[in-house]
Amino acid sequence: MEVVYEDNHIIIVNKQSGEIVQGDKTGDRPLSDIVKDYLKDKYAKPGAVFLGVVHRLDRPVSGLVVFARTSKALSRLNKMFAEGEVHKTYWAIVKNTPKESEGTLTHWLVRNEKQNKSYAYTSEKPNAKKAILKYKVIGHSDNYCLLEVQLMTGRHHQIRCQLAAMGCPIKGDLKYGAPRSNPDGSISLMSRRVEFVHPVSKETIIAEAPLPHDPLWQSFKP
């Protein structure tokens, strides 16, 4: 586990693809438990350690996850995430290059619980939720394109679904149209950067995740 930022109220860690943020029906050990153990050992805390989960990343996605270390930070961060005051920047390696080098995508997403998949429509549908993101082309390799993505809304599989609807599926994302999987089971999407006002100290916090060790990711290193 890699800690990117830590203080008395929050801890930001770099999640690896394949890890789950919070416990689920698979029974796999979640990142939240790993962070709790880290805090317990580091500070020699007796008894249970408080750790609040304020947001999640899909299992095959890597990058920054923010946790709260106090109940005060948890309640304030929950409000900040809900009100769009936490600015998250994602990087995605995609097949195909968008027609426009930057733009805004607006779709209505319908979630299929049984398939654990979202479907994008260009107009309103029953039970659909409006999804908006901004993207920008920031790099190219021989066969792929690197996009920087900022979410204006937070929907189920939003980036994966909307980029696929644009004709640019994320590398390795079989569920949304990639031709083949990545060898390690990841998809080439990461939570690269997070910026927000600290819920207690009110300082501006900016954290950035290192790129995955995969050679393709490393080829995009600034």
Regions found by a protein language model. Give the residues of each.
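RNA pseudouridine synthases
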Residues: 1-222
